Amino acid sequence: MPTFKGPVTVLDGRTLWFGTLGNGYKVRLAGIDTCELPQWALNPKWTNRDKQQAPTPVPCGPFAKAWLKRTVGNRPTTCVGLAYANDGIPVAQCTTNGVDLAAEMLRVGWARLDSPYINAQYYAYQTNAMAARYGMWGTYVLDMNEWRRKAVDKTLDRHPIADFNLLAERKSEISPPFADARNKPKRTDR
């Protein structure tokens, strides 16, 4: 498997572009999945139902991309290839300044585990993010694979009400239950 090194452009919350290598290479972060760029999540604190037709939208795809972009900055990135995805894109373990990018995305709550082989550290980061309601774990969000199957309009002009309607007919939900939504987070270190 190839190793990629150099400056990157962040395409979305899990995909990097090494534009200076050959004709350019897309590389996907191993072990995680994030919202697609046009995907919306919804704020569970929907109190004024008489005035507001749907909960406040949260652009989870752009937020995931922004966090990854902030983490990478303009520092060089190293990705060690592990496999190829079904679409032929290399899946790799990527680091910037010694920071594991997939672990960072899980730690801040803008990614979820997406691998049959669970890394114990990744699992701990995701569990802590869920408990503290970081990132997408503080919203109602449709499972990414289900969103990819059901969403008809996948353009960046997509309206949040479309994802509100998809959530109403969801088969699986990755959002944690909000019975304890009024409780303070277990962690306060962020």
Predicted regions and their residues:
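Electropositive
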Residues: 1-108
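Bulky hydrophobic/aromatic "packing anchor" residues in well-ordered structure
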Residues: 29, 105, 129, 175-176
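A structural motif
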Residues: 40-41, 135-138
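Short, polar loop/linker segments at the starts of domains and inter-domain junctions
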Residues: 42-52, 120-128, 180-190
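Short alpha-helical interface elements
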Residues: 54, 93, 97, 126, ...
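Charged, low-complexity, helix-prone segments enriched in Lys/Glu/Asp/Gln
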Residues: 61-66, 73, 121-134, 158, ...
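Conserved beta-structured recognition patch
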Residues: 87-136
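Mature, structured domains enriched in cysteine- and short glycine motifs
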Residues: 112-117, 138-190
